[in-house]
Swiss-Prot record:
Residues 4-266 form the Pyruvate carboxyltransferase domain. It is found in: Cytoplasm. It comes from Geobacillus thermodenitrificans (strain NG80-2). This is 2-isopropylmalate synthase. The keyword Transferase applies. Its cofactor is Mn(2+). GO terms for cellular component: cytoplasm. SMART domains: LeuA_dimer. The gene is leuA.
Length: 515
């Protein structure tokens, strides 16, 4: 049975989603979880693009041991050199080279002739092979390329040493039948193609990324590039979880196998959703909240009698467990640590101690602390602290049906200075955000504001997600608290702290690149 490799590009292509800005710690946590999921390859970033990306790729390569870590590179020596410096400490360093091959890209973007593009691609592969044992080569915009030219350049880069050939549907333009035919054409017209791996990379602009990827597998691809939850530029990329479960459930049809640990899918999906701020739609296949919900009476009756009447995927297959433990105010540190580990999270001793304090505070306010509550606290403790920037000290909001809503906010900056401001607004949240804007002394555009409950009940935690824009930079933030307004303030501050982190990284990059 053929084996299909999963190439996860959540940390590179996925992070290019509008408003997604992951810090180093968040990228490392996602990489560790992808390793638990047992993807074959993690594309950790684009090392030559910035100092921050370089450092993230380097640390991920040095941390992950059971997956191959790769980085993206243009067909230029300086990019390849940067990628090698970042990836050489990995367990199995590999490089992902690309150059555009469609007429529109060659003429308008590269301004190169087809012969010059072939020469650049071959030279880059040969140079990369001096360092990397595995070189993957991608034909950017392959699906709008002329097939004879595509076959010609693929032939030449294979001769130069490329061992993986990736055929991206860069703009999400192709149909399943056409995409499969490209793979058949290459298999029939490229010498020695049986000695290399063919890879698929699909975007979802026309809603066909997953089915196109499956078509590629049917027509000879042995690797698929995808992202968790299908995040990515524009309409996103092919969703890893959908391809993986389709191959598993329909193994009778596809006749392939993977090394993925499918029980880690739901946990991975939740992690990526929380850290990116991109909420998974309830009706999302495989990982959506409603994926295993049956509302129709006929369906409910059938499932109660025999699950397989209407449930082709068992929740347990992807790690959705009904085994939820409830902790309370009498639960100790040992019980907390055990449950954290059972939920699949790794925390340091210091993080456990800090989490225990927050857990006790919540347990005093709530009768029961559920797994959802605990996960929310873990995220807040592990990822939402930016000690060098701003932290919330207190908020006070005054509201009445016949009064003008007013907010008072007290913040502390990284140097311990106290900042206090007050402002009004049309509603409580607007008053709060107007006050915070005064605290930061920066014009901020609020692009999105979403709130959801963590678990059920009147005492449930509130989780708020925001997306903001300052000048040309968009970023997201999240906040958790029992009070909606406190959660709203935390989310806004979290987004602004990320903004200041991005600005600091930009300033550092300018120092590095300035002669």
């Amino acid at each position: 049975m053929r084996k299909i490799k999963f190439f996860d590009t959540t940390l590179r292509d996925g992070e290019q989603s509008a408003g997604v800005n992951l810090n180093l710690q968040e990228k490392l946590e996602i990489a560790r979880q992808l390793e638990r999921l047992q993807v074959d390859i993690i594309e950790a970033g684009f090392p030559a693009s910035s100092k921050g990306d370089f450092e993230a790729v380097k640390q991920i390569a040095e941390t992950v041991r059971t997956c191959s870590v790769t980085g993206l590179s243009r067909s230029v020596r300086s990019d390849i050199d940067a990628a090698w410096e970042a990836l050489k400490g990995g367990a199995e360093p590999r490089l992902h080279l690309f150059i555009a091959t469609s007429p529109i890209h060659m003429v308008h973007k590269l301004r190169m002739t087809p012969e010059q593009v072939i020469e650049a691609a071959v030279e880059a592969v040969k140079y990369a092979k001096r360092f990397f044992p595995i070189v993957q080569w991608s034909a950017e915009d392959a699906c709008r390329s002329e097939l004879p030219f595509l076959a010609k350049i693929v032939t030449e880069v294979i001769k130069a040493g490329a061992s993986v050939i990736n055929i991206p549907d860069t703009v999400g333009y192709i149909t399943p039948k056409e995409y499969g035919e490209i793979f058949l054409y290459l298999r029939n017209n490229v010498p020695n193609i049986e000695n290399i791996s063919l890879s698929a990379h699909c975007h979802d602009d026309l809603g066909m990324a997953v089915i196109n990827s499956l078509s590629a597998i049917e027509h000879g691809a042995t690797q698929v590039e995808c992202t968790i939850n299908g995040i990515g530029e524009r309409a996103g990329n092919a969703a890893l979880e959908e391809i993986a479960v389709a191959l598993h459930i329909r193994k009778d049809y596809y006749q392939v196998e993977t090394r993925l640990n499918l029980q880690e899918i739901k946990r991975t999906s939740n992690l990526v959703s929380k850290l990116t701020g991109m909420v998974v739609p309830p009706n999302k296949a495989v990982v959506g909240k409603n994926a295993f919900a049956h509302e129709s009476g006929i369906h409910q009756d059938g499932v109660l009698k025999e699950k397989t009447t209407y449930e082709i995927i068992s929740p347990e297959l992807v790690g959705v467990s009904s085994n939820s433990m409830v902790l309370g105010k009498h639960s100790g540190r040992h019980a907390l640590r055990n449950r954290v580990e059972e939920l699949g999270y790794t925390l340091s001793e210091e993080e456990i101690n800090q989490l225990f304090v927050r857990f006790k505070e919540l347990a005093d306010k709530k009768k029961d602390v559920t797994d959802d509550d605990l996960i929310a606290l873990i995220f807040e403790e592990k990822f939402d602290h930016f000690k060098d920037f701003y932290q919330l000290s207190s908020i006070q909001v005054q509201y009445g049906t016949n009064q003008i809503p007013t907010a008072v906010v007290v913040l502390k900056d990284g140097k311990g200075n106290t900042i206090q401001e007050a402002a009004t607004g049309a509603g409580s949240v607007e008053a709060l955000y107007n006050t915070l804007e005064r605290c930061f002394q920066t014009a901020v555009t609020l692009l999105d504001y979403r709130i959801e409950s963590v678990g059920g009940g009147r005492d449930a935690l509130a989780q708020v997600f925001v997306k903001v824009r300052v000048n040309d930079v968009e970023t997201s933030g999240r906040g958790t608290a029992q009070d909606v307004l406190e959660a709203s303030a935390k989310a806004y501050i979290n987004a602004m702290n990320r903004m200041f982190m991005i600005e600091a990284m930009r300033a550092e990059n300018e120092k590095v690149t300035t002669p």
